[in-house]
């Protein structure tokens, strides 16, 4: 059986490793701009203006990085 590719984890991990600033759009319309410091199956740890915020993934609509993310899909 071929391993399935988890694009979400690859995308978030590359943003974290590169230190790319990202705008996180929440379902309620609120926007947070910061850096991804970590993530798991349910949450994303975002550093915003030197402070940490733990965001539940079910509250997130979109991640918009300030530059394109390069990662392997195969």
Curated annotation (Swiss-Prot):
CDD domains: Hfq
Gene giving rise to this polypeptide: hfq
Alphabetized UniProt keyword annotations: RNA-binding, Stress response
GO cellular component, as recorded: cytosol
Domain of life: Bacteria
GO biological process, one term: regulation of RNA stability
A Pfam family recorded for this sequence: Hfq
UniProt-recorded name of the protein: RNA-binding protein Hfq
Domain Sm: start-end pairs: 9-69
Family: Belongs to the Hfq family.
Protein's job: RNA chaperone that binds small regulatory RNA (sRNAs) and mRNAs to facilitate mRNA translational regulation in response to envelope stress, environmental stress and changes in metabolite concentrations. Also binds with high specificity to tRNAs.
SUPFAM superfamilies in alphabetical order: Sm-like ribonucleoproteins (SSF50182)
InterPro entries from the UniProt entry: Hfq, LSM_dom_sf, Sm
Keyword RNA-binding: yes
GO MF term list: RNA binding
Signal peptide (from-to): none
UniProt subunit comment: Homohexamer.
């Amino acid at each position: 059986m071929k391993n399935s590719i988890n694009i979400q984890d690859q995308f978030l991990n590359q943003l974290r490793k590169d230190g790319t600033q990202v705008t996180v759009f929440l379902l309620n319309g609120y926007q947070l701009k910061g850096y991804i410091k970590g993530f798991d199956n349910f949450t994303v740890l975002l550093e915003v203006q030197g402070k940490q915020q733990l965001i539940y993934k079910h509250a997130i609509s979109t991640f918009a990085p300030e530059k394109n993310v390069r990662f392997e899909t195969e």
